[in-house]
Amino acid sequence: FYSDLGKHKIGSYYGFLLFIKLIIEQKRLNDFTRIRGTFEDFIYQYSFLIQQIVRKYRQSKKAYEHISKFYKCIMDLLIENNNLDIAQIAKEIIKNEEFMYLKVDLVDNEEVQIKGNFSRGKKQQIKLKTFVKSIPRCPICNGYLSTKSTSVDHIQRKRDGGNNSIDNGQLTHIYCNTTYKN
């Protein structure tokens, strides 16, 4: 929920909270877990679409419900079309009447100068790009893992003959290990 310049994006945060609330109420957490990795990749690569939604509604407080609908649209498209790649999902989103105004083409406005210094913003983007590559992923849902809330899981389950060796352990999301996997 941070921009590539490291600033907090309140609209994204509120929109995601509402989205999660709705999928819990609709008992669709397992659906979300199934597509979580691709969902997170999409949000990372197309974060500028959320900025466009906020701009349309002029402030985060007015935009967050639309951002929640945007997240739900992504989830539904990924579930219905699990063979589409992220760019194809972006093209499908703008077929939805509510999101036709979004410009989904990735545009590179970077000005490159020989012997030029990195701006503060570019430095932050380089850090983010580097750190995101190194974030571990949950082997069950392929979503990013937080260092603060993980579960240690048996790769081969105990009931299937799995042992307690280090080689038979993996870090997962708590939900993936305790609820989704079972």
Model-derived regions: residue spans:
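Conserved aromatic-histidine-acidic binding/catalytic patches
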Residues: 4-8, 114, 161
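Generic recognition of well-ordered alpha-helical segments
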Residues: 15, 171-175
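Histidine-centered nuclease catalytic patch
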Residues: 120, 126, 137-172, 182
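A cross-family structural signal marking well-folded subdomains
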Residues: 1-97
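Short, charged surface segments at domain edges that flank catalytic/cofactor-binding sites
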Residues: 93-140, 163
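Short, well-ordered loop/turn and helix-capping segments at boundaries between secondary-structure elements
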Residues: 22-26, 132, 161, 178
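Extended hydrophobic-aromatic, low-complexity segments
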Residues: 25-32, 87, 98-105, 135, ...
